[in-house]
Design a protein with these regions (language model features):
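Preference for long, solvent-exposed alpha-helical segments and helix-linker "stalks"
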Residues: 1-104, 113-114, 234-243, 257-277
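Short coil/turn linking the two alpha-helices of tandem helical-hairpin repeats
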Residues: 5-9, 93-97, 129-131, 148-151, ...
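Residue-level recognition of tetratricopeptide repeat
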Residues: 81, 116, 150-153, 186-187, ...
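"A position-specific structural signal for the A-helix of alpha-solenoid helical repeats
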Residues: 87, 122, 158-159, 193, ...
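Canonical positions in the second alpha-helix
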Residues: 109-110, 143-146, 179-180, 225
Length: 277
């Protein structure tokens, strides 16, 4: 790959070949790593693979703008070449370049040939960017149904929930977040997402104090998030601190004959029972 990097510096047109060289080297390293049986060999090969990845990422080629410029015309020329389209999708996903037109075009072309969860997600993001929510959600549903891996299914459900939340479709967003939880109960992110949904729409009653009780349900979800997933504890604790300031005062609740320890059911689309504290 070092030779490829030198070639690229002297010839800008060599960028795509540099990517091909990276994919080849990375594939060889992956294959060797999978075949290794001795722990020491595995460690050495893992270091080699990490070095290859780091070399590519730091090369200057691995930018979304570069990939868009390289792949946009090539995807158009290779609309029926499934192997090439998969390669484009893989590289752009690896580098988080999933908002580029080349990624969308490759996903749509590949999906027409051989529908997979990954191509469906690419199409889903494309229609999200275009503002067509019906098609966006339809493709994400396809991704969830096509995916065999439980954790990836959960991730697609979570992403669908996040997209719906961004469009203020709260009830539907909650359904997908709950689906993500049912598929992966150890991920705290869907709970945090639901908490933020509740906090974004706390009003369901004519009584201001009851509306403030929504924040108890918000905190319930945040506490659940950090109990199942310690990796989100810091984020959850910050949000708990923020939202706790919005809960009702004892005096507000007194006039409603409510006190600490009482249960209250949050109405509207939330439909959850929480405890006053």
């Amino acid at each position: 790959m070092d030779a490829a990097a030198r070639e690229m510096k002297s010839d800008e047109a060599y960028k795509e070949q540099f990517i091909q060289d990276y994919l080849f080297a990375s594939g060889v390293a992956d294959g060797a790593l999978k075949a290794a049986t001795k722990e020491n060999d595995k460690k050495l090969l893992k270091v080699a693979k990490d070095n290859i990845d780091a070399f590519f990422i730091n090369s200057g080629v691995a930018t979304c703008d570069n990939l868009q410029a390289i792949y946009a015309p090539k995807v158009e020329q290779n609309k029926t070449n499934l192997d090439y389209l998969k390669q484009v999708i893989s590289v752009m996903q690896m580098l988080n370049c999933t908002e580029q037109e080349a990624y969308f075009a490759a996903s749509e072309a590949a999906h027409a040939i051989e529908p997979t969860a990954e191509t469906a997600v690419g199409c889903g993001y494309m229609y999200y960017k275009k503002g067509d929510m019906d098609k966006c959600i339809d493709y994400f549903d396809q991704a969830i149904n096509l995916e065999q891996d439980q954790l990836k299914k959960a991730d697609y459900a979570y992403k669908t929930a996040a997209i719906l939340f961004s469009k203020k479709q709260l009830s539907k967003a909650k359904q997908y977040a709950l689906k993500a939880i049912s598929l992966d109960g150890n991920n705290g992110k869907p709970y945090i997402l639901i908490a933020n949904m509740y906090a974004s729409s706390p009003n369901w009653s004519d009584e201001a104090a009851l509306n403030k009780c929504t924040y108890f349900a918000v905190i319930d979800k945040l506490q659940k998030a950090k109990s199942v997933d310690p990796s989100v504890a810091e984020e959850a604790n910050k949000l708990i601190s923020t939202y706790a300031a919005h809960t009702p005062k004892d005096a507000d609740l007194f006039f409603l004959s409510l006190k600490k320890g009482d249960s209250v059911t949050i109405g509207g689309w939330i439909g959850e029972t929480t405890t006053i504290r």
